[in-house]
Amino acid sequence: MKFKVLNISTNKSSTIEVADTVFARGFNQALVHQVTTAYMSGGRQGSKAQKNRSTVSGGSKRPWAQKGTGRARAGTTRGPIWRSGGVTFSAAPRGYAQKVNKKMYKGAISVIFSELARSERLKVVSEFNIKEIKTKNITALLKALNVKDVLLMTDELDENLYLSSRNLYHVGVCDIQSIDPVSLIGYDNVVVTEIALKKIEAML
């Protein structure tokens, strides 16, 4: 499979060839859904907790005698039908992490990249070449590429690129070590450098 590589400085383009096994795979919705759900589940805090009848404060003593008062029997004031009593089916802290093996994770990333390439939403540039921290540089870059909602991807984190773009709505920056399925799906377009593309191919 071939990609057009745009040189932003000279406005000239060349081509780069990559493996079809990585960037031309068939779409597997079930795999992408499973890996994406597992990734999002891993980010859940899972610290929610409520008190049940055994942990809520209050006495375990009978509030009144079993017989003779004319009132209904009551064994404790900590039951769920009492004010300030425990919760019936109380939530407890738990982990939401789901196991996904490396082959599945890499496969899902590859499938997403393939779908982006197929729909012409994956663009390749020679380099971003952001020399100074200025938002207008990123605005000009996006205008040249004709993209708005976009994830900019480099082989290593570019501090100038990150700081220049963080004030722009719907523009994300990441390096290839930080690739995740949610970010790839969450943006309309992905722009990646030529070096990063080759490294992604080697990774997957």
From Swiss-Prot:
It comes from the Bacteria. Coiled coil: none annotated. Residues 68-77 have a biased composition (Low complexity). One of its GO terms (cellular component) is ribosome. One of its GO terms (biological process) is translation. The keyword RNA-binding applies. The keyword Ligase does not apply. Transmembrane segments: none annotated. Residues 47-58 have a biased composition (Polar residues). Gene3D superfamilies: 3.40.1370.10. Keywords: Ribonucleoprotein, Ribosomal protein, RNA-binding, rRNA-binding. It holds the Pfam family Ribosomal_L4. Residues 41-77 are annotated as: Disordered. One of its GO terms (molecular function) is rRNA binding. Part of the 50S ribosomal subunit. One of the primary rRNA binding proteins, this protein initially binds near the 5'-end of the 23S rRNA. It is important during the early stages of 50S assembly. It makes multiple contacts with different domains of the 23S rRNA in the assembled 50S subunit and ribosome. Forms part of the polypeptide exit tunnel. Belongs to the universal ribosomal protein uL4 family. This is Large ribosomal subunit protein uL4. The lineage of its organism: Bacteria, Pseudomonadati, Pseudomonadota, Gammaproteobacteria, Candidatus Pseudothioglobaceae.
